[in-house]
Regions:
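Membrane-interfacial, low-structure loops and terminal tails that flank and connect transmembrane helices
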Residues: 1, 85-95, 152-154
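N-terminal signal-anchor transmembrane alpha helix
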Residues: 2-27
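Transmembrane alpha-helical segments of multi-pass membrane transport proteins and ion-pumping complexes
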Residues: 11-20, 40, 44-48, 71-79, ...
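Transmembrane helix-loop junctions in multipass membrane proteins, especially transporters and channels
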Residues: 23, 27, 82, 86-87, ...
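Extracytosolic (periplasmic/ER-lumenal) interhelical loops and adjacent juxtamembrane/interface segments
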Residues: 28-55
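Hydrophobic alpha-helical transmembrane segments
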Residues: 47-69
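Juxtamembrane helix-break-helix junctions at the cytosolic face
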Residues: 56, 77-90
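Membrane-embedded alpha-helical segments of integral membrane proteins
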Residues: 61-72, 76-77, 93-153
Length: 154
């Protein structure tokens, strides 16, 4: 249980900062983009029974599920990073890991995940464009990495 607390806290912080960016200055919010993509992928024959079962709130359930999915994915990535950090602490290589983790997470989101969600590379297809997407995800990834690498060690 102790191994999951710091990565889970980092994931919650990253998701909360992302939401703050969305509502404060209109930055991108991955769970929102994922829910939009999810609804475009569901065929009409499958969507009708889902809508009957869950009613009007079905889009909110999907949105909540996407938030939980993002937190879970960031927690799993964080647990893997923390394991690697614990192995490298003896050699003193953990100090540079913050920058490596932050840049890797930001690059994965901006170059890998956003294009899959039809947002373009670095959020070019979003209303705010890359001028909002890049700073938002750099701050999110930097905060996430800082909590992961500065949190209590095992």
């Amino acid at each position: 249980l102790r191994d999951i607390l710091t990565p889970f806290g980092a994931a919650l912080l990253a998701t909360a900062l992302e939401a703050l960016g969305r509502f404060a200055w209109g930055g991108p919010y991955l769970p929102e983009l994922m829910a939009e993509k999810f609804f475009t992928l569901i065929p009409v024959w499958a969507f009708t029974p889902l809508f009957r079962t869950f009613g009007y709130g079905s889009k909110y359930y999907a949105f909540g599920g996407m938030i939980a999915g993002e937190v879970a994915a960031l927690t799993l990535v964080g647990m893997a990073v923390r394991r690697r950090m614990c192995r490298r602490q003896a050699s003193g290589g953990a100090s540079r890991l913050t920058a490596v983790v932050a840049s890797s997470v930001a690059a994965a989101i901006l170059i890998g995940i956003l294009p899959l969600l039809d947002a373009g590379i670095a959020g070019q297809a979003l209303p705010g464009g890359l001028w909002l997407a890049v700073p938002t995800f750099v701050v999110v990834a930097g905060s996430y990495a800082a909590v992961l690498t500065r949190g209590p060690s095992r």
